[in-house]
UniProtKB/Swiss-Prot annotation:
Compositional bias of kind Basic and acidic residues: 215-235
SUPFAM superfamilies the UniProt entry points to: Coronavirus RNA-binding domain (SSF110304), Nucleocapsid protein dimerization domain (SSF103068)
Protein name from the UniProt record: Nucleoprotein
Originating organism: Porcine respiratory coronavirus (strain 86/137004 / isolate British) (PRCoV)
Function text: Packages the positive strand viral genome RNA into a helical ribonucleocapsid (RNP) and plays a fundamental role during virion assembly through its interactions with the viral genome and membrane protein M. Plays an important role in enhancing the efficiency of subgenomic viral RNA transcription as well as viral replication.
CoV N NTD domain: residues covered: 31-153
Pfam families hit by this protein: CoV_nucleocap
Listed Low complexity bias regions: 154-163
PROSITE patterns: COV_N_CTD, COV_N_NTD
Length: 382
């Protein structure tokens, strides 16, 4: 019966007895690979205090073979000559396999925690260990995973060796490149010193002249990026104002399109106060969800109208700028007003220099228009 083993029963087992001893155990250079990814233990936690006694991964073996142990892997890193401890990692092995293949179930070994499913056979399994060319499996359990355990993904000894070798090769290549770059820098510094000395003497090398010509050619060939919005194939209500006259896309100012003075209409988004004015306009979501919408048929199209009401701070400078743009097309521009003032002062000076004309010959021409005083006002064009 001893060779056939007995079935595991945790019924009378104390939860604190977990098969751990104070002995250091034996070191094995070539540790067999686990079938599963490891668990990284939270810093400061004790694996044997948190690990459930039936904490056997799912996916390999039959009901009788759900028995084994978790084996600790201590890790550290050298930082400035000092050894810095890293969180422990624990790997699972089935009974009769792994670094403690000869150990019996519940033998007290340092860095070993025994686990088994109720009803598993207490005898070595024949499952073996993972081959070096096979990928480790993800950990899956029937019960809840303790919060101190982090289940790693695709972490195995062969992968670790590969990464270590890769880092070593990368480090060697980096050092080689570093030495090569250092030598190149020395050569470049000598070359630069010679070129600087020649430049002081007024001597320019062919290489310097080629560089100068190349840079000039690059500057001449460089093209200014076109930032003009692509409005040609868009509906009017989907177009975006660019730099320049906006009447091409939105039409002349009228009672139905009454925003913008002559400067804003002529320059579009490049107008001086355009960014400030745009900040006073409602967002798309505000218009969409905060407006009153109506629609009606208009030939083969649908005419959509919305009414949106919102409030701007009365004393804010941006509000004043914004209000000045409403119906501005119907008001004289500041430029025209200034032209009228200058023209009026000029005519007054001319009249004072002329001879006095008898009162009977004076006629009232105050309402006569001068072509320099005429202000062009956009009208609705259909």
């Amino acid at each position: 019966m001893a060779n056939q083993g007995q079935r595991v029963s945790w019924g009378d087992e104390s939860t604190k007895i977990r098969g751990r001893s104070n002995s250091r155990g034996r070191k094995i250079n070539n540790i067999p690979l686990s079938f599963f990814n490891p668990i990284t233990l939270q810093q400061g936690a004790k694996f044997w205090n948190s690990c459930p006694r039936d904490f056997v991964p799912k996916g390999i073996g039959n009901r009788d073979q759900q028995i084994g142990y978790w084996n600790r892997q201590t890790r550290y890193r050298m930082v400035k000559g000092q050894r810095k401890e890293l969180p422990e990692r624990w790997f699972f092995y089935y009974l009769g396999t792994g670094p403690h293949a000869d150990a019996k179930f519940k033998d007290k070994l340092d860095g070993v925690v025994w686990v088994a499913k109720d009803g598993a056979m207490n005898k070595p399994t024949t499952l073996g260990s993972r081959g070096a060319n096979n990928e480790s499996k993800a950990l899956k359990f029937d019960g809840k995973v303790p919060g101190e355990f982090q289940l790693e993904v695709n972490q195995s000894r062969d992968n670790s060796r590969s990464r270590s070798q890769s880092r070593s090769r990368s480090r060697n290549r980096s050092q080689s490149r570093g030495r090569q770059q250092s030598n190149n820098k020395k050569d470049d510094s000598v070359e630069q010193a010679v070129l600087a000395a020649l430049k002081k003497l007024g001597v320019y090398t062919e290489k310097q002249q080629q560089r100068s010509r190349s840079k000039s050619k690059e500057r001449s060939n460089s093209k200014t990026r076109d930032t003009t919005p692509k409005n040609e194939n868009k509906h009017t209500w989907k177009r975006t104002a660019g730099k320049g006259d906006v009447t091409r896309f939105y039409g002349a100012r009228s009672s139905s399109a009454n925003f913008g003075d002559s400067d804003l209409v002529a320059n579009g988004s490049s107008a001086k106060h355009y960014p400030q004015l745009a900040e006073c306009v409602p967002s798309v979501s505000s218009i969409l969800f905060g407006s009153y919408w109506t629609s009606k048929e208009d030939g083969d199209q649908i005419e959509v109208t919305f009414t949106h009401k919102y409030h701007l701070p009365k004393d804010h400078p941006k509000t004043e700028q914004f209000l000045q743009q409403i119906n501005a097309y119907a008001c004289p521009s500041e430029v025209a007003k200034e032209q009228r003032k200058r023209k009026s002062r000029s005519k007054s000076a001319e009249r004072s220099e002329q001879e006095v004309v008898p009162d009977s010959l004076i006629e009232n021409y105050t309402d006569v228009f001068d072509d320099t005083q005429v202000e062009m006002i956009d009208e609705v064009t259909n």
